Amino acid sequence: MKIKLHFILLVFFLSSAFIVAQDKDPVIESIITEANENSQLEPLAHELLDVVGPRLVGTPQMQKAHDWAVAKYKSWGIEARNEKWGEWRGWERGITHIDMLSPRVQTLQGMQLAWNPSTSEDGVTAEVITLPENIKDSLDFVKWLPNVEGKFVLVSMKQPTGRPDYNWEEFATEESFEKMKDERDAQSSEWRANLNRAGYNGRSVIGALEDAGAAGIVASYWSRGFGVNKIFSARTKKIPTVDLELEDYTMLYRLAEYGDKPTIRVVAQSKELGRVPTFNTIAEIKGSEIPEEYIILSAHFDSWDGATGATDNGTGTLVMMEAMRLLKKHYPNPKRTILVGHWGSEEQGLNGSRAFVEDNPEIVKNVQALFNQDNGTGRVVNISGAGFLHAYDYLSRWLYAVPRDITQHIETNFPGTPSGGGSDNASFVAAGAPAFNLSALNWSYWNYTWHTNRDTYDKIIFDDVRNNAILTAILAYMASEDDERTSREKIVLPMNSRTGEQRTWPEPRSPQRDGGRN
């Protein structure tokens, strides 16, 4: 009896294996094999991140990236072009050198902020001072303002610790950790209140300091991790603005507090390039049966320039480029057109994708599905239905074709809610197109690489990025081949608990097409 049962089970399993083998899609199998055995991710990452570098809108590096992508797509036999959608302030970063000259000599770790005017070759040398404490009111601050003339002013709060909270939590006593957090919270509250009493906030006070004759602005936007600062743009029009790493910034702050009168020299060589055109890079594999319907692969191409934009959004860019390469090689005649958009100026407000949506209503109207990736190097772990009522019907069908070793990590949320911002999928969702964000595993993204001075090639987890390229290519293939057109029916959004009013679907917003003007 046992022998007979074992024989039946064996036949069952062999039959099941045969059925599975018969069900394997040769296109999907070839995509997986190509991605694993002939991946181009590493050389693409090197060319984009090490050679081209950061991709701040309006810079020569951004233009170089656009041209590089077009050439790369054409080398794969994929039609590609740069589509102009606006203009921006042209600017090019040069060498930044920041040195403390007194009370001792030390080179400081920091950089000029984006779109900041250049200094002379000799730079600017001046004493460093702090903002006053215990400001009574705006009149009190006005009386103090003449003190900034000819001085560098420290405009960020002096952090009480350079150790991130997770390090405290691991090693400190509970009492010490709680004490530090309480003191830091109190210090932060007083810092903001002090500026408010002066009639300003952390941003607006910079203009007042420049107008009062400050020689320059020194900031430090710590990202709550070892050695990481967030790097954005300057708010001064004529004087240098630099961001210093926490260790050097707090040292200068203490020296100024204790009356040691530190002096620094800042040399910041940048170039103003006038008004320059801004682009999206578009590539497409034309559909053979329904070319007027589109699957869109989406990733913003620009970055802030504190580092090289490896995980924001170099990795998203790599995923989409590799997916397109895989599709062109193993699915060269798709049923629907597969288009990839590498958007410009996402960091300043989704400008490139909003411009594409505004300029291409016929394409947007005929989007079968859009897949966007923009939050780091990790494997995709979450996909939301974005508020489309029937998203489960087709997304679950497409995901079923993806290997289990990839989908086992993915949580789905249906029907989900529409995104009003955050990344470029939101531009399409607002226009009613079924656009889905492929949300990635954290890998300490928010503290260590997002908009920081450490967002570099070495932070990429290529195994995860490879999985994401396979996932994206298969989703695009399945969406293209689907016999059914995807539904755009939207959920009824819930009431806003704060206002008591019905929530509404996000509205399309126009891009900023003439950016970077002072």
Which residues are covered by each model-predicted region?
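Bacterial Sec-dependent N-terminal signal peptides
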Residues: M1-D23
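N-terminal capping segment at the start of a domain
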Residues: K24-T59, I95, R224-A234, K238, ...
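Metal-dependent peptidase/peptidase-like ectodomains
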Residues: V105-T107, E121, A126, P146-G150, ...
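N-terminal hydrophobic or amphipathic helices/low-complexity stretches enriched
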Residues: A21-K64, A71, W76-E79, I285-E289, ...
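Soluble metallo-hydrolase cores and metallopeptidase-like ectodomains found primarily
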Residues: D25-V27, N116-V142, F232-A310, E322-K335, ...
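Second-shell loop/turn segments in exported
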Residues: I28-N36, D50-P60, A126-N134, Y166-W168, ...
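Noncatalytic luminal/extracellular "stalk/propeptide" segments of secretory-pathway proteins
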Residues: K24-P26, H46, D50-D185
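His/Asp/Glu-rich mid-to-C-terminal helical/loop segments that flank catalytic regions of hydrolases
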Residues: P240-L244, R325, Y445-N518
